[in-house]
Amino acid sequence: SGYNVKGLFMQNWQNEPGEECTSEVDFKDASSVCDVLDIPLHRANFSDEYWDRVFKNFLSEHEKGRTPNPDILCNREIKFKSFLDYAFKIGADFIATGHYAKLIDKDNNRFLARAKDLNKDQTYFLHEVKENEFLKCIFPLSELNKEEVRQIAIDQKLITAEKKDSVGICFVG
């Protein structure tokens, strides 16, 4: 019983040679976590898809004087399409993400709902993801607050336990 877990690291931004690349630091952190948890780590590069389906839209909207939110498009177009498809190709039945959100099953439907930690709730960033794409998703942080998540990481001796929260837009770091 239980799950056969695989780690999957997604890279959405391709830095120019010589530019600082936080995704490499993030990949090393993910690799360290997977080593501690004794699970394999796969790496997927979605930078082309991200450029075409998220960043071009961001630039276009910005040129029109609007303030787009690339995280919403990244979730809709990359995390819950490209990432999901890739996960299934390598044998996944479900994906689990670190989003602070909850999924509720009712009357043969799956609904997005707010997480327990309202300060970290990410449902706004997920509101454009289609219901059918949530059918194969698990949000294990839905009933936890940030302090509980940090404590679990500390207890497991994960290198990311004290890592600063990400507050940037999706493609930066």
Question: Predicted segment positions?
Answer:
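Internal nucleotide-binding/catalytic subdomain
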Residues: 129-173
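ATP-dependent adenylation/nucleotidyltransferase module used to activate substrates
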Residues: 1-128, 147-149
